[in-house]
Amino acid sequence: GVIDAAKKVVNVLKNLF
């Protein structure tokens, strides 16, 4: 869902920074 996608994006950003 949209929420799951948003959480995935947040996790990726955290990994990058």
Swiss-Prot record:
Shows antibacterial activity against B.cereus, L.lactis, L.innocua, M.luteus, S.aureus, S.epidermidis and S.uberis. Keywords: Amidation, Amphibian defense peptide, Antibiotic, Antimicrobial, Secreted. Expressed by the skin dorsal glands. GO terms for cellular component: extracellular region. It is found in: Secreted. The modification Phenylalanine amide is found at residue 17. One of its GO terms (biological process) is defense response to bacterium. Transmembrane segments: none annotated. The lineage of its organism: Eukaryota, Metazoa, Chordata, Craniata, Vertebrata. This is Uperin-3.6. Its main location: secreted.
